[in-house]
Amino acid sequence: MSNQLIYSGKAKDIYETADDEIVLISYKDQVTMLNGAHKEMIEGKGSLNNQISALIFDRLNRVGVSTHFIKQLSETEQLNKRVAIIPLEVVLRNVAAGSFSKRFGVKEGQALDEPIIELYYKNDALDDPFINDEHVSFLKLATDEQIAYIKQETHRINAYLKEWFASVGLTLVDFKLEFGFDKEGMLILADEFSPDNCRLWDNAGRHMDKDVFRRQLGSLTQAYETVLERLRALDQ
């Protein structure tokens, strides 16, 4: 299949298809940290992320969450609706970890009384700064109603996935979401949901996400394979 490249990102390439409203997503083996400043190629990582994200998005579609996901094509490719992405990273935290622990001096691993949502302006040149609702309004990134909907959907997604992951012995520590508008102007969930953009800990406290790479804790693909195997077993 010969498709024109639309966009090449850190972890995925996006290609046109014969349908203007559908894009082909190809997952890469590249893994990055420090907002892309450090990069490595890890064989099999793209395939694992594609399969995990496809499985999770299919689940979300089935429980009524509107997403861009259409279907998985191969181990590394999937079809998605074409979406105009809002330049916001929506982070939900269930447990203190990573930058949250550093910013607020909270011990990593402390469960939060209630899930906390944070917003980041998706802008590589500015290093994706932490912003609030007023900043979003000033920058005209989204309306108050759209932000309210995004937060509502993020909490709904969290409630479902937290329980689902817990059923296979994984704690959903935190995750990042992105939203955008489809051709009808409907605000839907986009991007991916994989161990690249969430934190997962097993019942022994072992990291099962990209922190394995960031902190040099062992085999990244082995951790991702474990996540995929557990989710697949539950989905059968």
UniProtKB/Swiss-Prot annotation:
CDD domains from the UniProt entry: SAICAR_synt_PurC (cd01415)
Catalytic activity: 5-amino-1-(5-phospho-D-ribosyl)imidazole-4-carboxylate + L-aspartate + ATP = (2S)-2-[5-amino-1-(5-phospho-beta-D-ribosyl)imidazole-4-carboxamido]succinate + ADP + phosphate + 2 H(+)
Enzyme Commission code(s) on record: 6.3.2.6
Root EC class: ligase
Pfam families: SAICAR_synt (PF01259)
Pathway: Purine metabolism; IMP biosynthesis via de novo pathway; 5-amino-1-(5-phospho-D-ribosyl)imidazole-4-carboxamide from 5-amino-1-(5-phospho-D-ribosyl)imidazole-4-carboxylate: step 1/2
UniProt GO MF annotations: ATP binding; phosphoribosylaminoimidazolesuccinocarboxamide synthase activity
Record-given protein name: Phosphoribosylaminoimidazole-succinocarboxamide synthase
Organism: Streptococcus equi subsp. zooepidemicus (strain H70)
Lineage, highest ranks first: Bacteria, Bacillati, Bacillota, Bacilli, Lactobacillales
Gene assigned in the entry: purC
